[in-house]
Amino acid sequence: MAFRQALQLAACGLAGGSAAVLFSAVAVGKPRAGGDADTRTTEPLAWTGARPGHGVWDSNWDRREPLSLINLKKRNVEFGEDELASRLDHYKAKATRHIFLIRHSQYNVDGSMEKDRTLTPLGREQAELTGIRLASLGLKFNKIVHSSMTRAVETTDIISKHLPGVCRVSTDLLREGAPIEPDPPVSHWKPEAVQYYEDGARIEAAFRNYIHRADAKQEEDSYEIFICHANVIRYIVCRALQFPPEGWLRLSLNNGSITHLVIRPNGRVALRTLGDTGFMPPDKITRS
């Protein structure tokens, strides 16, 4: 009886949280009143839903908590506690995902068009060093997913030489952009409100698509590389750790740096390293 009551309480909590979450990610980075005015909206971001209180971990952050995947309306009618336990086990993740987020190497910032913003000679050296470092870890990487922007593609080309046989996939979701208005604001970088509105939805979609606990069918731990951009990585780190996403600009990442996130089967997330470039000589480290 106690088991049934506990399940009912947990089910109500998870169901309520799931129902409150809207997949209208376009609300991320909602424009400020009056364009560049400092007045901030008090409307919560769409992806936050009914989040727990400050400092409380949301165990169903990726909407893959086993209990939330069961049709609770049918539970009492079609199956009992034994069947419920079996279904929970069916949806339960078994493997750990290791996410390696790589920032692209130094590039020509003066290129008039995106295709002209190619890696500098130093940037190519940085990519070589990053590739060597990843290969030295001795891990069986499952795939490389990279931004479709030129500097990310060229970084991937070089790193891939050190990881033969690892498949690579290009995506527009990981392209650089303005994820959400930073807090505190900065004076040297002020995108238009519409850029936050458009880029924010895309980058949030990238987070939801790629950052989550392993599928229940995955039997072994996976090691995945994502080669993209500083803003995207910093936003993803904040979201994954359930830190305020507006704080993304407080983090700093060097070119070619390695950030390592771990997502456990129970949905817990840990940050192993942030922006590691300790494998590069000091004179090879840049942030441009």
From Swiss-Prot:
The keyword Cytoplasm does not apply. It is found in: Mitochondrion outer membrane; Mitochondrion inner membrane. The modification N6-acetyllysine is found at residues 115, 143, 190. Its main location: mitochondrion. It catalyses: O-phospho-L-seryl-[protein] + H2O = L-seryl-[protein] + phosphate; O-phospho-L-threonyl-[protein] + H2O = L-threonyl-[protein] + phosphate. The keyword Phosphoprotein applies. Keywords: Acetylation, Hydrolase, Membrane, Mitochondrion, Mitochondrion inner membrane, Mitochondrion outer membrane, Necrosis, Phosphoprotein, Transmembrane, Transmembrane helix. Residues 1-6 are mitochondrial matrix. The record marks 24-25 as: Cleavage. SMART domains: PGAM (SM00855). One of its GO terms (molecular function) is protein-containing complex binding. Phosphorylated by the RIPK1/RIPK3 complex under necrotic conditions. This phosphorylation increases PGAM5 phosphatase activity. Belongs to the phosphoglycerate mutase family. BPG-dependent PGAM subfamily. This is Serine/threonine-protein phosphatase PGAM5, mitochondrial. The lineage of its organism: Eukaryota, Metazoa, Chordata, Craniata, Vertebrata. The gene is Pgam5.
